[in-house]
């Protein structure tokens, strides 16, 4: 519907000036009991500027930074798994409410929405890919052993900044404690690679991911045509939608 309205506007359709304000049957009277909209910000480009791209890992967004922290720690702990006493994960309220899960995970859908599972895979493998949610990976007893050692705590600053419109952080931090009393460094990641605040890092990786996925479907020549068009904004904006969509039709 939003795209349809944009196209109508570009063609000069002015719409109905009184659709909101008409007495009795206008939107304000029918739905808002006579009150008008009260918006936290002016209509602008905030939503598009703050799009989150899922780049690094196929993980639910509240866990992206936890997996990144886990991958960072992988090299330090991969040979000390049996020595781990506790894995402390500091996170935000939304992550605790939505993806913190204990107990049996029955299928990939359970696993890819479990903070502890995704973190465990990152610690064990130094990566997280889609296949890691399947039964053969989940059946590795080390996964649940690590999950059982995890302690989840809320960091109030993380919860606060998750909701702040100028930040919208998705923070997680991990620190691992060993039986001998030693510990790793606390690894904190506040913004995932796909966040607005990490565009400089994220965009090149996003372009690589786009090209990599194109190559699973199209010939080299078609991929080159699509990439050439999509990396030239001026040309792309002038390209009819039908021509663009034709490039995406299977060969």
What is the meaning of each model-derived region?
Residues 7-251:
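Terminal-appendage/accessory-domain detector
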């Amino acid at each position: 519907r939003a795209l349809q309205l944009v196209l109508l506007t570009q063609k000069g359709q002015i719409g109905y000036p009184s659709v909101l304000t008409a007495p009795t049957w206008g939107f304000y009277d029918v739905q808002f009991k006579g009150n008008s909209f009260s918006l936290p910000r002016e209509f602008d480009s905030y939503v598009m500027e703050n799009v989150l791209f899922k780049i690094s890992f196929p993980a639910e967004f509240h866990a992206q930074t936890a997996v990144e922290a886990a991958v960072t720690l992988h090299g330090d702990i991969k040979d000390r798994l049996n020595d781990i006493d506790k894995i402390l994960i500091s996170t935000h309220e939304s992550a605790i409410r939505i993806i913190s899960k204990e107990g049996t995970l029955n299928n990939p859908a359970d696993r890819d929405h479990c903070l502890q599972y995704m973190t465990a895979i990152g610690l064990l493998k130094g990566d997280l890919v889609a296949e890691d949610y399947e039964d053969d990976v989940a059946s590795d007893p080390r996964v649940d052993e690590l999950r059982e050692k995890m302690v989840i705590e809320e960091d109030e600053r993380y919860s606060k900044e998750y909701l702040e419109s100028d930040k919208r952080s998705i923070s997680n931090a991990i620190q691992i404690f060993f039986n001998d009393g030693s510990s790793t460094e606390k690894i904190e990641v506040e913004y995932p690679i796909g966040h607005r605040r990490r565009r400089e890092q994220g965009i090149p990786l996003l372009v690589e991911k786009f090209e990599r996925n194109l190559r699973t479907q199209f010939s080299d020549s078609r991929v080159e045509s699509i990439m050439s068009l999509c990396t030239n904004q001026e040309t792309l904006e002038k390209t009819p939608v039908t021509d663009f969509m034709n490039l995406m039709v299977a060969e």
